[in-house]
Regions:
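Accessory, solvent-exposed terminal regions and/or long lumenal/extracellular loops of proteins
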Residues: 294-371, 375-379, 461, 468, ...
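Bacterial N-terminal signal peptides
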Residues: 8-18
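Sec/Tat signal peptide C-region and signal peptidase I cleavage site
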Residues: 18-24
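Histidine-centered catalytic/metal-binding microenvironments
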Residues: 459-532
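Substrate-recognition/cap regions that form aromatic- and gly/pro-loop-enriched pockets
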Residues: 354-481
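Bacterial N-terminal signal peptides that target proteins for export
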Residues: 1-8
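Second-shell loop/turn segments in exported
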Residues: 152-156, 166-174
Length: 532
């Protein structure tokens, strides 16, 4: 998702985007050989105050011959598009896609175009971006910035696809990552892109790939390239393109054979010091907001996975080659470690966000107002985070979902199946305590106000439920897919019920500050009052 401001190096100049739009995301791949469970995982934090917090099950369907599939716009790409009845919440009004996208009192979203429909489409889980389908195809996403072209508006003559709809078409039609990448590349070449530069992580039960794309200045086709993450390694992206050398005839890369010529024709082509055509340099893939907005998260995630790599926290510029595409973790990463990676605020480092003058009250790691603060992996504007797992030992593919920032929330497992009503049709502008997002929100807001005192209570509760849920998943491995999905829905109900009660327990701890000690990491100096 896109940032509101871009601070681009002096040679390019500073640009302030006028349009209100979404913030940013962090997304990772843990390959089979890098996972303690031997299971491929994809993670994605959906970081935007404007994000629709609903998670939707889209059922499998059969379609009559000659049917067309509508391709819809989305507000999360940049801003709302009233001319298309396209708004932030709900993200889509299209009852033909899923019951959860049926809002009879609202006007239907207007498509940008359409494509021939497949005879059969697979069931999948959907958010602002597609999550996972019934065959274990998994996606993650982050928006990137190209100083050449930061945004291409949707209009006649421009492409009809943004990454969100592109990923959904892949989930509807594909079983494997390679199949999905080739399909999405074909769609880009045929129908074109609009919006911003994007990364889509694409994985299946065996392997993970990174697909990066960028609209062209003409709105025809698009630049795109995909690279495989080697088995046994961990990958992270954080709002900046990560693929470097474009390597023809490399089986670990997939791209339009005309990509090198397209870059030259656009005047974008740039080579690295060895003379290789370089994707990051060709895209002029600068960071959003300010230096380290993206690179700090890349450094931290890679360093958490592989401390022995001793990667530098500081680099010379946005085009640094100090960080490898992926790393081999020092030890296989557990599910708990993957969850906690998305809770990280650089704790224990010289840039620990809980300490120093910029720290919030009660050592909060969050910053408000000016966007030039260090961007942590956890963030105050996270709407939800998912961790997908396609495990053959389970009855069906599953994912873990945390509403709001996971640092103040809990991950709950679900199958690729109909979800509880608590996860559908929530409105961020109207409090509704029957909805999971609002149940989480009341705990989140209270915790952030008294962070050092209350966050340990929340973290302990989250870890306990995550342990219980993991045991339940293992114990349910021999159930049918339908039984497994129901078991997880019932578990979600228990977690949400406890989370409602957790808010009351936190108020008891708070007790109007009487029993709360202020954290020494950020203790404001008192004014000296010694005389009248």
């Amino acid at each position: 998702m896109k940032a509101k401001l871009f601070l681009i190096p002096a040679a390019i100049s500073v640009f302030c985007a006028a349009a209100p739009c979404a913030e940013a995301c962090t997304t990772t791949i843990v390959t089979k050989g890098a996972s303690a469970d031997g299971v491929v995982c994809v993670t994605h934090s959906n970081d935007a105050f404007s994000s629709d917090p609903n998670i939707v099950y889209v059922p499998a369907k059969d379609h009559p011959e000659g049917s067309m599939r509508a391709v819809y716009p989305c507000a999360i790409a940049w801003d709302e598009l009233p001319e298309y009845e396209c708004y932030e919440n709900p993200r889509l009004v299209a009852p033909e896609r899923a019951d959860a996208y049926d809002y009879p009192w609202k006007k239907r979203t207007k498509p940008l175009g359409d494509i021939p429909e497949a005879a059969h489409t697979y069931a999948y889980i959907d958010g602002d971006y597609g999550v996972m389908n019934e065959h274990g195809l998994m996606l993650g996403e982050c928006t990137n910035n190209s100083a050449h072209l930061e945004y291409l508006e949707p209009k006649e003559g421009h492409g009809i696809f943004y990454a969100s709809e592109l990923g959904r078409v892949a989930l509807e039609r594909c079983r494997t990552a390679r199949e999905a990448i080739r399909l999405m590349g074909e769609m880009i070449d045929t129908y074109g892109l609009w919006g911003t530069g994007e990364t889509l992580l694409v994985a299946d039960k065996e392997e993970g790939w990174v697909l990066e794309m960028q609209p062209t200045p003409t709105g025809k086709g698009g630049f795109w390239i995909a690279q495989r993450v080697p088995d046994g390694e961990f990958f992270v992206a954080a709002n900046q393109f990560r693929i470097r050398a474009i390597r023809p005839n490399d089986p670990d890369q997939i791209f339009n054979p005309r990509l090198p010529d397209m870059l030259k024709e656009a005047g974008w082509a740039a080579c690295d010091k060895k003379g290789n055509l370089d994707w990051v340099l060709s895209m002029k893939a600068v960071e959003d907001y300010h230096p380290y907005y993206s690179l700090r998260r890349v450094w931290r995630a890679l360093s958490l996975a592989a401390p022995s790599a001793k990667l530098p926290a500081k680099v010379k510029n946005w085009d640094t080659d100090a960080y490898p595409f992926s790393v081999r973790p020092d030890h296989p990463m557990t599910l708990a470690e993957i969850m906690d990676l998305h809770r990280d605020a650089y704790e224990g480092t010289p840039i620990d966000r809980r300490e120093g003058n910029g720290a919030g009250l009660f050592a909060s790691p969050y910053r408000y107002g000016d966007s030039k603060w260090e961007r942590t992996i956890t963030a105050r504007h996270i709407a939800y985070t998912w961790i997908t797992q396609a495990d053959d030992s389970l009855p069906c593919p599953m994912f873990w979902l945390s509403m709001n920032a996971p640092a103040e929330s809990v991950y709950i497992p679900f199958a690729v199946a109909p979800l509880p009503e608590a996860y559908e049709k929530a409105d961020r502008t109207k409090c509704d305590m029957t909805k999971a997002w609002w149940i989480s929100q009341q705990v989140t807001i209270l915790t952030r106000g008294y962070y050092s005192a209350l966050s340990p209570v929340v973290r302990d509760a989250a870890h306990e439920w995550e342990r219980r849920s993991a045991k339940l998943v293992t114990a349910s491995a021999r159930q049918s897919a339908e039984e497994f999905a129901q078991t997880l829905r019932e578990n979600a109900g228990r977690v949400l019920a406890d989370w409602r009660e957790l808010h009351g327990r936190l108020l008891s701890v708070n007790d109007g500050d009487r029993r709360i000690d202020y954290d020494g990491a950020h203790r404001p100096a008192a004014d000296k009052v010694e005389k009248y």
